[in-house]
Amino acid sequence: MKPLNIIFAGTPDFAARHLQALLDSEHNVIAVYSQPDRPAGRGKKLSASPVKELALSHDIPVFQPASLRAVEAQAELATLNADIMVVVAYGLILPQIVLDTPRLGCINVHGSILPRWRGAAPIQRALWAGDTETGVTIMQMDLGLDTGDMLLKTSLPIEDADTSASLYEKLAVQGPQALLEALDGLNAGKLKGEPQDPALANYAEKLSKEEARLDWNKSAKQLWQEIRAFNPWPVSYFEYQDSTIKVWQASYNPQPNSALAGSIIKADKHSIEVATAEGSLQLEIIQLPNKKPLAVADILNSRADWFAQGLSLLPEASS
């Protein structure tokens, strides 16, 4: 089979992993699209995206239009005569004229098993909801938000130790493999799109810092899911002793207890156990303001008085 001439569109590191897989394949990446350089770091200097940096290191032309709605940008893309456009976490909307420009259209790598978790935060929402598996979907793009026909799906189990950070790494390996398999299938004319069932679809909303505040009136299992979903960002937290305390790692005990939600059942070298609406949450790695995340055993060496049995972590109790 003749190698495909590919336009790649993406911006963050997750996308760069997919671009690298294409560069290592027999296919030809003829151009790269990435979002305009953004101010980053303390000096707020303009910074190129990981995708742009990778493309430039391989002498691939990079295009950074602020929008693909402009006629000039659309005409420029058409002159590239691509067979297909691969889109991974690009961040710009593709109008219909762009979707129709490459011979095989535009395909997208999405970090969930569609139609579940369409939208911006599929990896995090799978953890947040307590899903037992996630995966990658390669889909033919249309004008909707992750609504296109599914070309290929892969899955992997979500383990108890998984966080958004670890799932991100796993999908950053699985995604490029699925992408190459889908490209080979499309190139051979053997891959047929499967329409999504709208009745099975739901939406993965972006995370917010406010959402990461731990609510002791939820179940311990739900809080455990949130802590894993919000690691590495925005990181679950609670307000206590006029401080914002972040929780990086926890486990939970589903057994009922008689303690009030938010009160400390016990604190030892293994964890700080806090009562919730259902069961108890065992805090294992936490972070005090302007400090590094530490195991609870190290925190208790200097702050045992904060976490004595019977104290309440509810904001009004510590003010």
UniProtKB/Swiss-Prot annotation:
InterPro entries: Fmt (IPR005794), Formyl_trans_C (IPR005793), Formyl_trans_C_sf (IPR037022), Formyl_transf_N (IPR002376), Formyl_transf_N_sf (IPR036477), Formyl_transferase-like_C_sf (IPR011034), Met-tRNA-FMT_C (IPR044135), Met-tRNA-FMT_N (IPR041711). Pfam families: Formyl_trans_C, Formyl_trans_N. It catalyses: L-methionyl-tRNA(fMet) + (6R)-10-formyltetrahydrofolate = N-formyl-L-methionyl-tRNA(fMet) + (6S)-5,6,7,8-tetrahydrofolate + H(+). Keywords: Protein biosynthesis, Transferase. One of its GO terms (cellular component) is cytosol. It comes from the Bacteria. It is an enzyme of class 2 (transferase). The keyword Transferase applies. One of its GO terms (molecular function) is methionyl-tRNA formyltransferase activity. Disulfide bonds: none annotated. (6S)-5,6,7,8-tetrahydrofolate binds at residues 112-115. Its EC number is 2.1.2.9. Attaches a formyl group to the free amino group of methionyl-tRNA(fMet). The formyl group appears to play a dual role in the initiator identity of N-formylmethionyl-tRNA by promoting its recognition by IF2 and preventing the misappropriation of this tRNA by the elongation apparatus. Belongs to the Fmt family. PANTHER family: METHIONYL-TRNA FORMYLTRANSFERASE, METHIONYL-TRNA FORMYLTRANSFERASE, MITOCHONDRIAL. This is Methionyl-tRNA formyltransferase. It comes from Shewanella denitrificans (strain OS217 / ATCC BAA-1090 / DSM 15013). The gene is fmt.
